[in-house]
Amino acid sequence: MNARGLGSQLKDSIPVTELSASGPFESHDLLRKGFSCVKNELLPSHPLELSEKNFQLNQDKMNFSTLRNIQGLFAPLKLQMEFKAVQQVQRLPFLPSSNLSLDILRGNDETIGFEDILNDPSQSELMGEPHLMVEYKLGLL
């Protein structure tokens, strides 16, 4: 055995990172890096995609700031409390909900959009056994 000891032998050895493959054809090392998630690496496909995803949130913020400037702090707080109360009221899990009261609060009850035509609950793909859905929602399963 060398007089310098085991620690110096480890220092003199080639680092593992130099032995690993690098470049465009490198395989993903699951043991060191874990599972790769492609969803996190995707960029928006179009510049307007992010704007469209956040449209309702931005619209609500703009309405709240306008209300605050015109009527004071009470009006947006009251409207936000009404939004929370309306969002908590739901039907049973197997029944479709139109959220009409939320549409009325936002002023969307007088507009017709593509979701009004293409979002028919009778054509939903997520139909299930009503008793199982209620038991799952209540945490009995």
From Swiss-Prot:
An example Gene Ontology biological process: proteasome assembly
InterPro entries the record matches: Ump1 (IPR008012)
Sorted UniProt keywords:
Chaperone, Cytoplasm, Endoplasmic reticulum, Isopeptide bond, Membrane, Microsome, Nucleus, Ubl conjugation
Tell me the residues linked by Glycyl lysine isopeptide (Lys-Gly) (interchain with G-Cter in SUMO2): 39
Checking Pfam families in the record gives:
UMP1 (PF05348)
Which intervals of the chain form a coiled coil? none
List cellular component terms (GO): cytoplasm; cytosol; endoplasmic reticulum; membrane; nuclear speck; nucleus
- The superkingdom of the source organism is Eukaryota
The keyword Signal belongs to this UniProt entry's keyword annotation: no
Compartments, as annotated in UniProt? Cytoplasm, Cytosol; Nucleus; Microsome membrane
UniProt entry tagged with the keyword Metal-binding: no
Q: Which family does it belong to?
A: Belongs to the POMP/UMP1 family.
Q: What does this protein do?
A: Molecular chaperone essential for the assembly of standard proteasomes and immunoproteasomes. Degraded after completion of proteasome maturation. Mediates the association of 20S preproteasome with the endoplasmic reticulum.
Record PANTHER family: PROTEASOME MATURATION PROTEIN, PROTEASOME MATURATION PROTEIN UMP1
Subunit note: Constituent of preproteasomes, but not of mature 20S proteasomes. Within the preproteasome, may directly interact with PSMB1/beta6, PSMB4/beta7, PSMB5/beta5, PSMB6/beta1 and PSMB9/beta1i. Interaction with PSMB8/beta5i is controversial. Forms tetramers.
Q: What is the recorded name of this protein?
A: Proteasome maturation protein
> Corresponding gene?
POMP
